[in-house]
Structure formats: C-alpha cells, structure tokens
Amino acid sequence: MANKLFLVSATLAFFFLLTNASIYRTVVEFDEDDATNPAGPFRIPKCRKEFQQAQHLKACQQWLHKQAMQSGSGPSWTLDGEFDFEDDMENPQGPQQRPPLLQQCCNELHQEEPLCVCPTLKGASKAVKQQIQQQGQQQGKLQMVSRIYQTATHLPKVCKIPQVSVCPFQKTMPGPSY
C-alpha cells in the first residue's frame, strides 16, 4: 500500500513539474558589445552615414551629457527616477518652451530617417558614456549612464519624431567595458 501511495505521489509530482515547466518560457537576448562588433550600434549602413553627416548628433550629445551630470533634483527637464519630459510635452505653448539645446537636438533628430533615429541616438549615447568615462567621473557613474540611456530612450517621443516613440535600449550590467 505504501508503495502504491509513493508511486502515485511521485507520478503526480512529476506531472506537476512537467506542466509547471512548460508554463514558463525563458527569453535570452544577446546585447552584442558594440566595441567588438565592427558595425557598432549601426546595423544599417545608411544609419552610420547619417550619423556621420549629422556630425554625430552634437546637440543631442550635449543634451545627454547635461542630463547625465544633473542630479535628480533639478527642474522638470531633468530626470527624477522616472522620466519627467512627459509633463512638459503637454505644454500647450509647444516646442518653443523647450530649452534651446533640447530644441537643437530635436531638430537634429527630425533630419534623420525614422529608421535611423534609434541607432544614431545609441551612437550618441555611447559617445557621451565614453566622454564621462574619460573624464574620470567615478562618483555616481552608474546613475549617469542610466540617465543617458533613459533620456535617449524617450527623446523621440519628446521631439515628436514621426513613426518613433521610444528607442528600446537594453539595460546592460556595468562591466569593464565602461
């Protein structure tokens, strides 16, 4: 009797584990290191050319750098944990109320092909991240890098880029490649 009870229990446990395992699905995403990938952030050659012609989105780089260096306790155009641009986007006075540097960045992004907006923003973000690294900014570096990519992620929405609302940059763990 104990043998049958054990066999039934083991069978039920096996089926439970089998059905439970089939419910969950693991998604593995590879974030290639752009430093070792010759294409870098530009999977589309046309985007690399646009990035170079746009002088590497200089105004956007300056805006990203400014946002990275500010703490979360600034005006509404800075980051405070979550993205604060959305409150200002609904300003009925429109884009003329944007800070001039942000407006220049938006102008640069509007000149890009919609397909290239995110790759060029990723290139600009990487350039800013490297600038911060070269400046030797150790204090709060992880937060600065996070603010760079968080700002860049939402810039298409802030700038009202057609066909692009956000750039889905993957968050990567900090490593020696900083």
Curated annotation (Swiss-Prot):
Cotyledons and the axis. CDD domains: AAI_SS. Residues 22-38, 75-94 form a propeptide. GO terms for molecular function: nutrient reservoir activity. It comes from the Eukaryota. The keyword DNA damage does not apply. It holds the Pfam family Tryp_alpha_amyl. Residues 1-21 form the signal peptide. The small, basic, water-soluble napins are one of the two major kinds of storage proteins synthesized in the seed during its maturation. This is Napin-B. It comes from Brassica napus (Rape). The gene is NAPB.
